[in-house]
Amino acid sequence: MKSILLIGMGQFGQILGEKLINMGDEVMIVDKDEDVINLLAPKYTGAVIANCMNADNLKTLDVPSYDVCVVTIADDFQSSLEITSLLKDLGAKYVVSKANTDIQRKFLFH
């Protein structure tokens, strides 16, 4: 069982979250949309309403304590890139970020 921090609970994040739970992982979800978090929270280990573009918000999540941090924000690449960078700066052990193009993948990979 792994501990997963899942940021961005749009369609892809919700599907991934369900699969991770079904595999027995502990999943903490984060999204800036209060309605989404309120709807999904009962299914997950934990749920936080937060804008992860703010480093202080990410610091409260104790990023290094998770085995994997996943960023599933696909419709705003700038946000995805910045959150990925912040997670790495905060000591994330392993970061996975969704990319829609090869160029986005290259930016996120480095």
Q: Whereabouts are the PLM-identified features?
A:
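Cytosolic regulatory regions of ion transport systems
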Residues: M1-H110
